[in-house]
């Protein structure tokens, strides 16, 4: 069935979330679904998440701006749950506009969005350097410290830029606090008040036309019959509450975060699409039960894992870091399905498995001699998980570009069918290549 033949109901909302440790291919799927939406919303995270789009063979990486910006006429929203670096935002806008993309007339930023300031970046990088071998693996872009300030109620918001005297007063108070940490604890240079003030206020006039009451706009858009697509960043297993803590990001990456992070009611979320790769990857530190390959760990150097990393081009789109690779972990996937209330799955990068003699699927674990069928909550327990695998015959035929389920190799269909069975939820979409058209549609998220 072609996407163009689908009759889409108006005024529906779909949330796209990653079900693994991020890098599941959400950007491509959001781009595909945007053909059926009038607005795309970012509701958490910052410019630590890169969404890679391949459109007509051209690669675009978006870090802050919703993927819908590549579709003329689609409104794009940055919700209050995001932490915003104006410097990163305008760099991204400049790159897009240089490529002929209209951004500023279609981008709307919540007035309540928390700002990332230079001292957040300095603290983030200083902490990671101090941790040494025990580092968490942050991107060093100030995301975590910005969220800390938000929760501590000392964060500066976008709307504060439009009241310069108040902004300056609060900035000075914040710098008194953070510079003490920087100089006395982390042993790095202080951040200059005047330079920071001048830089941040210089963004105010450029930001102002885009700043608005996003929650109200989303409500009005739905009321007028517009479909909205909520674009999650990172993945469920990196969620600050539900991930492999403390090896997590600083925000809630689950579907429920769309309500608080964009200002919409829970009943407005009609369908939750969980994105999962046909195998698993992870960047940075933290437990990974089905791991096969880690460039930094001599004990994890299996050839098949390196092949997955090489064929799958598994390098971070923002950091450039090599990703750790492993077999698909359905026990972890089930945890994500439960937390998010996933309606259906989209399996990405199936083509990376082409040509393998056999494919394995982690269906549970042995932990301290006991069988476990769901990813544990604590990192120490996850680190003790020994994977229990089911093994499937591989397929030699190429799946690249296939657009119909029945045209997939029989062994690929058997693998996907078993994933559905063990996960307990249908696979509604399958991605068979990086281009938006290389997609199999089984159920349409905006139609279900």
Curated annotation (Swiss-Prot):
SUPFAM superfamilies: P-loop containing nucleoside triphosphate hydrolases (SSF52540). GO terms for molecular function: adenylosuccinate synthase activity; GTP binding; magnesium ion binding. Its EC number is 6.3.4.4. GO terms for biological process: 'de novo' AMP biosynthetic process; IMP metabolic process. Pathway: Purine metabolism; AMP biosynthesis via de novo pathway; AMP from IMP: step 1/2. The active site is at 23 (proton acceptor), 51 (proton donor). It is an enzyme of class 6 (ligase). Substrate binds at residues 317-323. Mg(2+) binds at residues 23, 50. It catalyses: IMP + L-aspartate + GTP = N(6)-(1,2-dicarboxyethyl)-AMP + GDP + phosphate + 2 H(+). Binds 1 Mg(2+) ion per subunit. It is found in: Cytoplasm. It comes from the Bacteria. This is Adenylosuccinate synthetase. It comes from Paraburkholderia phytofirmans (strain DSM 17436 / LMG 22146 / PsJN). The lineage of its organism: Bacteria, Pseudomonadati, Pseudomonadota, Betaproteobacteria, Burkholderiales.
């Amino acid at each position: 069935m072609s996407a163009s033949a689908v009759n889409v109901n108006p005024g529906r909302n779909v949330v796209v979330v990653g079900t693994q440790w991020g890098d599941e291919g959400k950007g491509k799927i959001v781009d595909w679904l945007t053909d059926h939406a009038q607005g795309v919303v970012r509701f958490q995270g910052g410019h630590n998440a890169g969404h890679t789009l391949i459109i007509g063979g051209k690669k675009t990486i978006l870090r802050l701006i919703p993927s819908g910006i590549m579709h003329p006429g689609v409104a794009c929203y940055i919700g209050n749950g995001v932490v915003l670096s104006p410097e990163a935002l305008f760099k991204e806008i400049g790159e897009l506009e240089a490529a002929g993309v209209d951004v500023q007339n279609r981008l709307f930023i919540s007035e309540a969005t928390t700002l990332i300031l230079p001292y957040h970046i300095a603290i983030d990088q200083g902490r990671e350097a101090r941790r040494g071998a025990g580092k968490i693996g942050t991107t060093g872009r100030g995301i975590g410290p910005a969220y800390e300030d938000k929760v501590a109620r000392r964060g500066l918001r976008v709307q504060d830029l439009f009241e310069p005297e108040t902004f300056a007063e609060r900035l000075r108070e914040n710098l008194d606090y953070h510079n003490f940490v920087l100089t006395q604890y982390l042993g790095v240079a202080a951040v200059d008040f005047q330079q920071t003030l001048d830089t941040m206020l210089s963004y105010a006039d450029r930001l102002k036309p885009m700043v608005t009451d996003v929650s109200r706009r989303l409500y009005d858009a739905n009321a007028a019959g517009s479909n909205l697509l909520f674009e999650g960043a990172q993945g469920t297993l990196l969620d600050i509450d539900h991930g492999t803590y403390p090896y997590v990001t600083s925000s809630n990456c689950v579907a429920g975060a769309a309500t608080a992070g964009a200002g919409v009611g829970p009943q407005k979320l009609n369908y939750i699409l969980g994105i999962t790769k046909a195998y698993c990857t992870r960047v940075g530190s933290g437990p990974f039960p089905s791991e096969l390959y880690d460039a930094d760990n001599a004990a994890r150097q299996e050839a098949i894992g390196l092949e997955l990393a090489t064929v799958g081009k598994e390098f971070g789109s923002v950091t450039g870091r090599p990703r750790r690779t492993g077999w698909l972990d359905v026990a972890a996937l089930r945890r994500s399905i439960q937390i998010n209330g996933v309606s259906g799955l989209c399996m990405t990068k199936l083509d990376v498995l082409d040509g393998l003699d056999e494919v394995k699927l982690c269906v549970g674990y042995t932990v301290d001699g006991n069988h476990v069928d769901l990813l544990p909550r604590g990192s120490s327990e996850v680190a003790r998980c020994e994977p229990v695998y089911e093994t499937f015959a591989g397929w030699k035929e190429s799946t690249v570009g296939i657009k119909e389920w029945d045209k997939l190799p029989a062994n690929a269909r058997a693998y996907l069918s078993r994933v559905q069975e063990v996960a307990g939820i249908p696979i509604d979409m399958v991605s068979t290549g990086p281009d938006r058209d290389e997609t199999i549609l089984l159920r349409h998220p905006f139609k279900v």
